[in-house]
């Protein structure tokens, strides 16, 4: 009898179809029981997720019709009530500096855990291109990191990377509610990406969390892109189901919510209230927040942003957002985390490198003086400077939760949070948006979601800001300064700018890399997005189908 030549496949439960490439290492993550756990989460919560996504669309329709975001009168009692969240886990009381980066590649995970930061936020979201290989390798990496066994052999350099005796505490950021996982079908539908990310990570690691995170705590998460407290309520339900299934103490799972959408800034108390048993505070996701400001006000010609380089924390609406977040978190007894420092070391120019570090120091001094308890960094080289600023101000305290810091937020009003930003709009700004947006998207399509560009570590938020700003300027025919001459933003101007900037990118990266990369494809997608009649919600959602690779041989075995 001839030996079977059937391709190996994943052992999936009824109703689950794995379409991603089969790999024996991945099969250790995609076990039957793990997939059954993820499927159970999806089946229980998919109706609530669909409703929440429809409510997002309905809210946007109201904003497009002229309504402005505001505090919800129906939840006044929550905002004014005297309540606090569960006490801070002792193991993560000190979060003065957190380093962020994708969960894959493996060497980057090890370096981040060894970086000297208090926390490493391993990302399945904006800093990762969600290819099948990245997602599955990321789960393998985090399983090994939690176990303390992760290592990497760099054969060409003859170097082995391993964990130090003391490492950063591990947080994990799953994708947002809106993103699917098309390589896994549940009852014929794409899986909800964040439930795959969280579900697989939790299932394989919950028994080991206590050793690394502190007894009775874990996992620790960051939750992105929420717009309303109903979305936090779903996460709370997911956490409760997971804790019950694992037989661990309620409240073991803790999550920091990134306030990175304009609607969410009006829902911060409500979000914390929904997650009060599981909350680890809020974070100023400032780059995506700018993106969301444009998207929310896409139909409002009186709210055009200036060049994105001018939209910093000195703008009134950004400063108000930061102050209100700090006040809200400290009132509820949780961490108020600051925003990302995206600078990366400039190795060949000491003066430029010191100037960049000085910008980081000033930004972080502003944050800690305002009352933030910690902040984010994109590169290990920033950590010593940031720690010096925060630790020098805190004077040995792990955080400012019990202090009066952040009282400025008590007086923030609705109009403060939506005040139009000031500054010039220029053709140079349009050019930079094209140049950075196209290069980021090309890297994302090629499998990299954390991309060094012009001495900054960029993630998807940069491409999103660049895209929606160009779209907004074109949609409303914004007047742009072209070296002292006023020109109107038009599709014809954008086409010329794209052609010229693509040539510049080719000159910068070299013809061979340009030809082999996905730059031309990225240029077409970016141009189409900027000139579309209707603004797409997310660039990464539109481009996702271009990185999905179904392998029929990987489908579950049929006996």
From Swiss-Prot:
InterPro entries with a match to the protein in the record: Malate_synth_C_sf, Malate_synth_sf, Malate_synthA, Malate_synthase_CS, Malate_synthase_TIM, MS_C, MS_N, MS_N_TIM-barrel_dom
GO biological process per UniProt: glyoxylate cycle; tricarboxylic acid cycle
Catalytic residues (UniProt): 173 (proton acceptor), 459 (proton donor)
Taxonomy of the source species: Eukaryota, Viridiplantae, Streptophyta, Embryophyta, Tracheophyta
Cell compartment(s), UniProt: Glyoxysome
GO cellular component: cytoplasm; glyoxysome
PANTHER family cross-referenced by the UniProt entry: MALATE SYNTHASE (PTHR42902), MALATE SYNTHASE 1-RELATED (PTHR42902:SF1)
Keyword Cell inner membrane: no
Protein name in the entry: Malate synthase, glyoxysomal
SUPFAM superfamilies named among the record's database cross-references: Malate synthase G
A GO MF label: malate synthase activity
Organism: Zea mays
EC code: 2.3.3.9
Gene3D superfamilies, alphabetized: Malate synthase, domain 3, Malate synthase, domain III
Gene label: LIP
A Pfam family reported for this protein in Swiss-Prot or TrEMBL: MS_N
């Amino acid at each position: 009898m001839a030996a079977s030549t059937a391709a190996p496949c994943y052992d999936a439960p009824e109703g689950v179809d794995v379409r991603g490439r089969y790999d024996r290492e991945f099969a250790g993550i995609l076990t039957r029981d793990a997939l059954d756990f993820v499927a159970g989460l999806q089946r229980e919560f998919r109706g609530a997720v669909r409703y929440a996504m429809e409510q997002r669309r309905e809210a946007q329709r109201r904003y497009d019709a002229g309504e402005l975001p505001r505090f919800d009168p129906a939840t006044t009692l929550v905002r004014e009530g005297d309540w606090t969240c569960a006490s801070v886990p002792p193991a993560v009381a000190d979060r003065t500096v957190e380093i962020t980066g994708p969960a894959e590649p493996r060497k980057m995970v090890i370096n981040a855990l060894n970086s000297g930061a208090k926390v490493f936020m391993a990302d399945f979201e904006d800093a990762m291109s969600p290819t099948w290989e990245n997602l599955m390798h990321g789960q393998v990496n985090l399983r090994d990191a939690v176990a303390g066994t992760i290592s990497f052999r760099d054969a060409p350099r003859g170097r082995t990377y391993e964990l130090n005796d003391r490492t950063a505490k591990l947080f994990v950021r799953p994708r947002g509610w809106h993103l699917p996982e098309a390589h896994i079908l549940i009852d014929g539908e794409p899986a909800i990406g964040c439930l795959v990310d969280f579900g697989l990570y939790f299932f394989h690691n919950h028994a080991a969390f206590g050793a690394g995170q502190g007894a009775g705590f874990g996992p620790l998460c960051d939750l992105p892109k929420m717009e309303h407290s109903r979305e936090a309520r779903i996460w709370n339900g997911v956490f409760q189901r997971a804790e019950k299934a694992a037989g661990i103490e309620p409240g073991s799972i803790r999550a920091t919510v990134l306030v990175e959408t304009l609607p969410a800034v009006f829902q911060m108390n409500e979000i914390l209230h929904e997650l009060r048993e599981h909350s680890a505070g809020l974070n100023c996701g400032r780059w995506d927040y700018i993106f969301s400001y444009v998207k929310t006000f896409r139909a409002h010609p009186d709210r055009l942003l200036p060049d994105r380089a001018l939209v910093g924390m000195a703008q009134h609406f950004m400063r108000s957002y930061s102050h209100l977040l700090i006040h809200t978190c400290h009132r509820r007894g949780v961490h108020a985390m600051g925003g990302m420092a995206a600078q990366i070391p400039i190795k060949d120019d000491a003066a430029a490198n010191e100037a960049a570090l000085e910008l980081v120091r000033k930004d972080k001094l502003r944050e800690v003086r305002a009352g933030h308890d910690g902040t984010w960094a994109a590169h290990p080289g920033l950590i010593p400077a940031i720690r010096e600023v925060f630790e020098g101000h805190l004077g040995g305290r792990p955080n400012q939760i019990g202090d009066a810091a952040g009282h400025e937020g008590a007086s923030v009003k609705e109009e403060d949070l939506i005040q139009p930003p000031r500054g010039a709009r220029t053709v140079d700004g349009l050019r930079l948006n094209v140049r950075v947006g196209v290069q980021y998207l090309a890297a994302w399509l090629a499998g990299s979601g954390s991309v060094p560009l012009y001495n900054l570590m960029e993630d998807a938020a940069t491409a999103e800001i660049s895209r929606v700003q160009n779209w907004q300027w074109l949609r409303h025919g914004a007047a742009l300064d072209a070296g002292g001459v006023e020109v109107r933003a038009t599709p014809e101007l954008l086409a010329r700018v794209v052609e010229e900037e693509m040539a510049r990118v080719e000159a910068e990266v070299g013809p061979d890399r340009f030809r082999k990369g996905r730059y031309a494809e990225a240029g077409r997608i970016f141009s189409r997005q900027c000139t579309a009649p209707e603004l797409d919600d997310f660039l990464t959602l539109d481009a996702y189908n271009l990185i999905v690779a179904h392998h029929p041989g990987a489908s579950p075995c049929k006996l």
